[in-house]
Regions:
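Hydrophobic/aromatic beta-strand positions that recur at structurally equivalent sites within the blades
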Residues: 18-20, 68-71
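Structural signature of eukaryotic scaffold interfaces centered on beta-propeller domains
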Residues: 1-3, 39-52, 177-192
Length: 193
């Protein structure tokens, strides 16, 4: 809520919660007087945060953005990774121009799971999971790495023609936010969102 004030004290891997100058104990019924957090003492000075009512969002370039939410009592706090319906993707390593992509399903529809295979190049890595494949009008959210030449995903937009997609006409994108490329280092609320 907007009437209660807390002091959150971050130290190496822990967050202590004070209300009206009193340390809150037995956080989440754990017997601990702290909430475990992933940030080391050195990383604490690098976190950026924003807060709205009972929700605090924390960013650090080495971690998935975290959401800390106060529950129904002064000692009920949860921390979770932020989940995003949409996030940026980017083609970091365009090494498949000489390849040809083919779809394992004939005419897959929006929502279908399909497998895409590349011949003539081996561009697929585990870093592509969560990214996008685009070509011949179709868009697939990559959900699984199968091999260096194959991945599976969910069709978001149907292909005009999925028989053969030239590497030059395709885009194989990784999530822009990842352990390999880093995570957002800044955060804010805009219009209460």
């Amino acid at each position: 809520n907007i009437t209660q004030t807390y002091l959150l004290v971050f130290v190496d891997s822990k967050m202590y919660i004070y209300m009206d100058g009193v340390l809150q104990t037995n956080i989440n019924g754990s017997g601990n007087d702290y909430l475990t957090v992933p940030y080391s003492a050195a990383e604490i000075k690098e976190i950026v945060w924003t807060q709205s009512a009972d929700t605090l969002i924390i960013c650090h370039n080495d971690y998935v953005p975290r959401k800390i939410v106060r529950g129904s009592t002064h000692s009920t706090w949860t921390m979770s990774n932020m989940t995003f319906s949409y996030y940026p993707t980017y083609d970091f390593n365009r090494d498949y121009d000489s390849g040809t992509f083919t779809c394992g399903s004939s005419n897959p529809q929006v929502g279908d799971t399909t497998t895409i295979t590349c011949s003539g190049a081996s561009p697929v890595t585990t870093d592509h999971v969560g990214g996008m494949f685009e070509g011949n009008g179709g868009v697939v959210r990559i959900t699984a790495y199968n091999s260096s030449t194959s991945f599976s995903g969910t069709v978001l937009q149907e292909f005009i023609n999925n028989n053969s997609i030239s590497g030059i006409d395709a885009s194989l994108e990784e999530p822009a936010w990842s352990a390999a490329h880093g995570y957002p280092g800044s955060v804010t609320f805009h219009e209460s969102r």
